Amino acid sequence: MAKYVVGSAWPYVQTVPHLGNMIGSVLSADVYARYLRLRGHEVVFVSGSDMHGTPIEVEAIQLGVDPADYALKMHQIVAELFRRWDISFDLYTHTHSETHIKFVQEFFARVYENGFIFTRDDEVPYCPRDKIYLPDRFVIGKCPYCGYERARGDQCENCGRLLDPKQLIEPRCAVCGSKPEWRVTRHWYLDLRRLEDRIRKYVEGNPHLPLNAKEMSLAMLKEGMRPRAITRDNKWGIPAPFPGAEGKTIYVWFEAVLGYISAVVEYFKKLGREEEWKRFWLDQETKVVFFVGKDNVPFHVIILPALLMASGENYVMPTTTASTEYLLYEGDKFSKSRRWGIWIDEALHLLPTDYWRFVLVYIRPENRDTSFTWQTALEVINKVLNDDVGNYANRVLSFIKSRMGGAVPPPGKPSPEDEEFISKVAQLFQKAEAHYDAIELKEAVHTVVEIAREGNKYLNARAPWELAKKDAEAANAVLYRAFWSLKYLAAGLAPVVPRSAETLWAMMGISTPLTWEEAKKPPTPGAQLGEVKPLFRKITEQDVKVLLAKLEELRAQKYSRKYPWEQVLL
């Protein structure tokens, strides 16, 4: 049994996540964490709301509300939505917690004492109209690399490059749109140049990093590491702990990535085992796995490892950062301003949670950008989830219920075809296990579905309803192995569709908990089945039209309200 820290990217809570955010980080991390638990590993799965920084502050200024109140309201809503999506966090916290603030300040004080932080006077944008400095998302302009017109002062969301405001072409204030002036102010910098060789060694020598994360990180390293300012002049954030830094806050991305550690500290503190976090983060045998969209790669693959190195503590380096490509909606990027896409609160009003979870993992953008379309969703729900998986389970269990008195049949005397079938199922399960281990979640679920497809072919070929008329023992042998294959199917699908897997397990009447190893064990003959009912139902094109009409009605209600926390559908 191994120890794992699993973390999903911390969402900004100026709004709720959309489907792309979910599959890029939170849902993928949940699937992996659930899989690890099924295998019997010790897992701490954490994340939290990114409460600080310019997105919240800009929005709060525009709405005339206190950023702390705004962020806390949105945090509570997002946490509830994740619960409804069956995200199995051990702790979902936020960056304004006492534990996180204390941890961050003490951490950066050590980095400062170790000599990795220096000061420099810089010209920074200032808005004379709003009388505020314009760090990060307070200033927008054209990206010098890709030409994107609304690049932010810290990063271009189009090409993913890290930026500073001086690189922007035609910068403007994000609050009022006016042209900024430049003023001199002092900031504290992390000297990444001194850590560059160690970071390069970490990236180049990491066999677990996905290709997009490794290529993006090596490209940045090839350009050379520049010192990065870790303080800001905005008020909403964690006060910087450095001498002379009064009135400065820690740049949100530098403090948010430390949340993966502070959340584990907080988790064990809540359990009354305050020192146990060290058993995870200070043990080199622990595996640390992050799940992020590709725009978050630099902060997880370069910045966080650099901070851990600069701390001088014996922190375990992240094992991998599982990064996806982008999920599009009907061929285009998600856009809140254009209301293009589906947000996770809306999704829950349209289809059951397991349907969303299955479709998103089934089309997960692991190697290239992928588009969610309603046509694809229809095909996956109807042909894969209902016809392949649900139909197979129903065929096996209904036959046992109606023809065998609802009891698991004896194993009988298997034919070569029977032995070949259950052997193939075991091989598919092992293949799915390898995909889960490699965090190839899309391939894992596709492989598990093959168990159901093989099962349907097996039933058609062996026809136990005909065998039962002339050779009861042969029919028993078929149904016993078909039933056994459902154990494999339930376990393989459990990380993705936990509710449906538990329902299937209950219908099978199995009293032992659903685990990966339990699936491999032969069923107990004579065990009574539970209530058998269809696992899924089909969705028609007319259903989709009705759902989309309903979505427009829901949005009319949402956007008639003023405040973001009032616009969420609960």
From Swiss-Prot:
Keywords: Aminoacyl-tRNA synthetase, ATP-binding, Cytoplasm, Ligase, Metal-binding, Nucleotide-binding, Protein biosynthesis, Zinc. Is required not only for elongation of protein synthesis but also for the initiation of all mRNA translation through initiator tRNA(fMet) aminoacylation. The lineage of its organism: Archaea, Thermoproteota, Thermoprotei, Thermoproteales, Thermoproteaceae. Its main location: cytoplasm. A motif ('KMSKS' region) lies at residues 333-337. A motif ('HIGH' region) lies at residues 11-21. ATP binds at K336. GO terms for biological process: methionyl-tRNA aminoacylation. This is Methionine--tRNA ligase. Belongs to the class-I aminoacyl-tRNA synthetase family. MetG type 1 subfamily. Its cofactor is Zn(2+). It is found in: Cytoplasm. NCBIfam families: metG. Gene3D superfamilies: HUPs, Isoleucyl-tRNA Synthetase, Domain 1, Methionyl-tRNA synthetase, Zn-domain. Zn(2+) binds at C143, C146, C156, C159. Its EC number is 6.1.1.10. SUPFAM superfamilies: Anticodon-binding domain of a subclass of class I aminoacyl-tRNA synthetases, Methionyl-tRNA synthetase (MetRS), Zn-domain, Nucleotidylyl transferase. It comes from the Archaea. One of its GO terms (molecular function) is ATP binding. GO terms for cellular component: aminoacyl-tRNA synthetase multienzyme complex; cytosol. It catalyses: tRNA(Met) + L-methionine + ATP = L-methionyl-tRNA(Met) + AMP + diphosphate. It is an enzyme of class 6 (ligase). Binds 1 zinc ion per subunit.
